[in-house]
Amino acid sequence: MHIHVVKRGDTLSSIAAMHDALPAFVAADNGLTLSTPLVIGQALVVRTPKTLHTVRVGETLSSIARDYDLSVRTLLRRNFFLHGRELLREGDVLAIDYADEAPLGTLGVNAYAYPYIGGELLDSVLPYLTYLTPFTYGITPAGVLAPLDDARLLERAARYGAKSLMHLSTLTPEGNFSSENAAALLQNDRAQSALLAEILQTMAKKGYYGLDVDFEYVPPELREDYAAFVCRLREALNAEGKPVVAALAPKTSAQQRGLLYEAHDYALLSKAANAVFLMTYE
């Protein structure tokens, strides 16, 4: 992989030729089109294909992947210009592998998605995701799940090999995280039991891989109650082979003040859950 800084007179074609790449690949990898004008000083990622395959009549993504002992998911990842589409055209040129790109390690990638996300955008990112998390299942104070139209997202995630996480939050239909709903649930053992039973039923019915717990604006005095609730979820779900992730607000210190932060005790929640997701976008 190269980082090319655009100079006067550079074009996508000349840059691609300089690095033994293809203009269409350079454009797609940098969020450009072949007609996008370049700007002097602009930095572009350029990847040099090691092996190329030109699509012939009758070939499919699956057959090509099989010929090179690759998964369809890997082939899609290596050809971002496809944007997740599986329909190939005769003459399409695919990168089978790239030069000088040894694996650096492993990385788990999760993305939240609203049920109304556009299909083209969803399909373009799914090959790169480890997990897809439809947003969100809210709760009532009595421990009843608010429904979520997640069927399309779950179907697409399964098609592209991404595991699905069920997202549990205190978000209300009005779009606000409810401190009141969180407090009512965390102080009501019967409501927690009802919610846990419904979560297990929903996950089994819809094929969810795990659970992401995202309670925000929890009253500070319920810090330990929240951690105990997450622990209770983990124990029940782990028994079914399902992990529990706790979403944490970003903090600069354990003493950080504010309703968003104080009940998110990093030490307690990291022990209560199987993993944590640090919401640095907050």
Model regions and ranges:
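Soluble periplasmic/extracytoplasmic beta-strand elements of cell-envelope proteins
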Residues: H4-K7, A43-V45, T54-R56, V93-A95, ...
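Short, structured beta-strand/loop micro-motifs enriched in basic residues and often containing a Trp
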Residues: D20-N30, S71-N79
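Short, structured interface segments
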Residues: N30-P49, L87-D100
